[in-house]
């Protein structure tokens, strides 16, 4: 189905910079997210007919409700999307609209960058569709403003068509998903549902209830600096030790060499001097045993290096971030089976596969609300090559509407 307000709503959202900040200690991590919630989303929620709208400054969540209009539909279902965007320029987003894409190169404004099927063969799946791209200087923000727009559009449609019977619905728009802390303070008592869905997936048909289990690894290395001309048997180069540590991690256990259910170590920043060096990693895996083994391996590696050095110079701090929500959701597959049935009714092929990442649903599921993830449409997310299909967004709205009518 087509929804006349969907595209305009999405374009309005993405033009607002809501980039999160991992260095911040506030909630939300950036004021722009709270402003977006209070000055854009909250008035719109009121205008389209949501009730019991509340913004909680303690956790950054904006919540609203739409009561059931049928006694036959007894479930209470939630839909969740996040307001922040990833760690890439989000100031001055200028979307391009490519109507009826016919294939080939899409120039991204005057940036000198292009979307090419040779680099991004997923483009070939969108022939004839309306694509929204960046101008090459920013990300787009379809992750996850497409999800927000889809939820809003579905609610607007239900209120405008009261003859459509639906269950109790709650919606929540939250902060800081991209920096991994958005759901830490989620208030399950304020979100009284049987189960929920994050609308935060990628291409058409994605339906996910498995995520990585995740940990952060901080490496600190202490060296000893002396003049390089007289350094023999005296200098201890912290940068070299950090490189030695990294070189002992399995060479094939990296993001660029893994897929499916394979885990990895990912070095995402390194800095330092001869005197002191730091490196930051993320650790990811699906199975508990593999996840624990990865964490134990880096701890043991540091101990072995210190033993060889004869001093405590290599320090690792491992902090768990979130866990695979499969262990919660597989206890009752109702939310997955319901979404799957709705997709099949709509002739959408469900693509049920693990998320090689996490969602707010990872943490919310462990708080007691099973929360699988549904496609929102974004492709090539988190950078200048991000794009989304309007037709996929429309189908996401269709799925939301189907779920609340089938609950």
Swiss-Prot record:
It comes from the Bacteria. It is an enzyme of class 3 (hydrolase). SUPFAM superfamilies: Bacterial exopeptidase dimerisation domain, Zn-dependent exopeptidases. The active site is at 84, 177 (proton acceptor). GO terms for cellular component: cytosol. PROSITE patterns: ARGE_DAPE_CPG2_1, ARGE_DAPE_CPG2_2. Cleaves the N-terminal amino acid of tripeptides. This is Peptidase T. It comes from Streptococcus equi subsp. equi (strain 4047). The gene is pepT.
């Amino acid at each position: 189905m087509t929804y006349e307000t969907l595209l305009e709503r999405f374009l309005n959202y993405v033009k607002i910079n809501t980039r999160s900040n991992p260095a911040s200690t506030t909630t939300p991590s950036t004021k722009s997210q709270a402003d977006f919630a209070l000055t854009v989303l909250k008035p719109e929620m009121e205008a389209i007919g949501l009730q019991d709208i509340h913004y909680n400054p303690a956790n950054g969540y904006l919540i609203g409700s739409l009561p059931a209009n049928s006694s036959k539909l007894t479930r209470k279902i939630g839909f969740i999307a996040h307001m922040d965007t990833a760690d890439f320029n989000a100031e001055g987003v200028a979307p391009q609209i490519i109507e009826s894409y016919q294939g080939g190169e899409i120039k991204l404004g005057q940036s000198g960058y292009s979307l090419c099927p040779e680099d991004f063969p997923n483009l070939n799946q969108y022939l004839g569709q309306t694509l929204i791209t960046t101008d090459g200087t920013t990300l787009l923000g379809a992750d996850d403003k497409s999800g927000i727009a889809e939820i809003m559009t579905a609610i607007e449609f239900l209120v405008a068509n009261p003859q459509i019977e639906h269950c109790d619905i709650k919606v929540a728009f939250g902060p800081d998903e991209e920096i991994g802390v958005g759901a830490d303070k989620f208030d399950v008592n304020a979100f009284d549902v049987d189960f929920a869905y994050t609308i935060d997936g990628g291409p058409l048909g994605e339906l996910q209830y498995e995520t990585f289990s995740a940990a952060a690894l901080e490496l600190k290395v202490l060296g000893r600096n002396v003049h390089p001309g007289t350094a023999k048997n005296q200098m201890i180069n912290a940068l070299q030790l950090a490189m030695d540590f990294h070189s002992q991690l399995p060479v094939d256990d990296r993001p660029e060499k893994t897929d499916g259910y394979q885990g990895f170590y990912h070095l995402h920043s390194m800095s330092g001097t001869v005197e002191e060096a730091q490196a930051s990693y993320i650790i990811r895996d699906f199975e508990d045993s593999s996840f624990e083994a990865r964490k134990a391996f880096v701890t043991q590696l540091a101990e072995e290096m210190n033993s060889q050095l004869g001093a405590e110079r290599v320090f690792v701090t491992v902090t768990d971030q979130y866990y695979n929500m499969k262990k919660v959701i597989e206890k009752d597959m109702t939310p997955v089976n319901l979404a799957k049935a709705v997709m099949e009714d709509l002739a959408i092929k469900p693509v049920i596969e693990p998320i090689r990442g996490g969602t707010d649903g990872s943490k919310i599921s462990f708080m007691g609300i099973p929360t699988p993830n549904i496609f929102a449409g974004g492709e090539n997310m988190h950078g200048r090559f991000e794009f989304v299909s309007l037709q996929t967004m429309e189908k996401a709205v269709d799925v939301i509407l189907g779920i609340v009518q089938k609950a």
